[in-house]
């Protein structure tokens, strides 16, 4: 699935933060040609040949897992606006994709529901130090934090219908995270009663981390504020580069975080340094 840098930074349905209409051409053309290049370059089967913009789809692995691939970037995302986060008309998925996704979850007969999508769904607070800082708000506005009404709708759908074993797989922010996705009753002391699902965020292979967006000062502040202000965030690594391996079986789904010592040596090896899992029929992470 694509994210924003196949077109322009912080892209949405009708534009992008890094696109100036007119002087950089028409957004509709830029998006069309970028998606054409993506489709021609990557071996991806389009779920709807009549609609080149639709990439959301389901991949089934027997009765073990359904993998839902979403488009939280280009298909029907409204422009980022943090002040509209609780507006029910402010969409990340859009109505058509959301209806499809909710129906698939509701009717799933697979043991695990793995959701691959672009931006972090778990809440992120910088506490009183950072929450009012515009640069930090802009970061959150591009995540599900900027579309809280839609996030709450998904959480309600999962819990009200007792949909189990939902695991979110995320990229975008070039850093590593292991998160419970909390409800309003989340408690750090008893996360099992307040988590709706879990999330693993993979870092980038070589691209810079959050310091490239936030600046080194805010990034350093964030590093010290994440755990005290976000008890549902179980692990975060803002510095190292690497990849994740997701291991799914009937007992549990586990994410192994692999990192390299340096990104400048082609023959450098990788090491698994952190392991988190969720058990079958549980909604909160455990450390392996």
Regions found by a protein language model. Give the residues of each.
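Metal-dependent phosphoester/phosphodiester hydrolase catalytic core
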Residues: 1-288
